[in-house]
Amino acid sequence: MYYMIALFMAVNVFSHIPNMEKMEAKAAEAKNYCVECDMNTKFCILVDYSLHSGVDRLFVWSFEKNCVIDEYPVAHGRGKSKHLYDRPRFSNVPNSYLSSLGMCRIAERYEGKYGISYRLDGLEKSNSNVRERDIVIHSFNDMPDTEIYPDYCPRSRGCVMVSENNMARLDDLLKDEQNVLLYIYK
């Protein structure tokens, strides 16, 4: 019995640490896509929704330095359930309130209900409806600036939602760039 509890705790703790091998593979995939499709080759944004929502799981990846240059917590879609805090589900269906997986182009900047926001264009079948669904990058005042594990972050209606301070940092990176790739995976 004690062995099972210890094993569960070890698995639970380690599942909240980013898998760098996986991240490097996703970054390489993103870079290849950016080169082939004439997108920004300075950096991309990776979101690993396999991680606990209370840890950093949005990563700004520098293609030039081949490493993470910034990271912070990000919300996932709540769906129609009150129980999707740490086991996100994904959808491309309008009104599902779930996040979508896949590559997106970060599109135009605008001032929305939550301040500075960025529209997204889905580049894959799994996220082809993100613009129609109004899935965007935006801030929310209840999102933490830093990790809060083992607590959970608030959930969104499918949007890539970060804290106001982290949105300001993202905006500094994005506002003068074009065709930046956002890659959401699990």
At which residue positions do the language-model features occur?
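Charge-dense polyanion-binding interfaces
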Residues: 180-186
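Cell wall/extracellular polymer interaction/catalysis modules
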Residues: 13-157, 164-180
